[in-house]
Amino acid sequence: FFLTSNTFTMLLRNTLLYNILFIVLNIVIPVTLAVLINQIYSRIASKAYQTMMFFPHFLSWVVVSYFVYAFLNPDKGLMNTIIQFFGGDKIMWYSQPKWWPLILTFMQVWKSMGYNMVVYLASITGIDSTLYEAATLDGATKWQQTKYITLPALKPIIVMMFILNVGHIFYSDFGLF
C-alpha cells in the first residue's frame, strides 16, 4: 500500500532532489573554496581558514543543528539581528515550511564542505608548479590558470568525490533527515 501511495512518491522525489542538490553544492562550493584558499599567500591565514571550515565535519548532527538554531533563532539569532538592523521584520524560520529546504541544505553543505575542500586543496597542491610558472610567463591571468590548469587537473578527484557522494545517498541512517 505504501509504495503505491502519493506519500511514497513525494518522499522519494524529495529525497532525490535534496541529494542531487547536496551533491552539486558539495562539488561546486568546496572546489571554489579550495581554489580561493590556495591563492592565499599567508600560510597562517590559509591554515586558519582550513581549520575553521573543516571543524564542522567532526561535530555530530545534534551540535550542528544547535549552531544553526542559534544562527536562525527568531529572537536573538544572527540572521534576524542582521535583518532587523537593515529595517526588515524578523523571520520565524522554523515555523514556516518554505524555509526548511534552505535550512536542511545549509546544514548539510556546512557540515560536509570542509572535508571536501581539504580533499580538493590537497589535490591542488599536488599540481606541478611549473605549469603555473609557464602560464604566468605566457601572460595567463589567475582566472585563466584556474580554468585551464587547476580545474582540468581536479577532474579525476571531482569524479571520485561525485561517486562517493552518490554512495552517501544509500546510507540507511539518513543522518540529516
Predicted regions, residues:
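A structural signal for multi-pass alpha-helical bundles of membrane permease subunits
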Residues: F1-F177
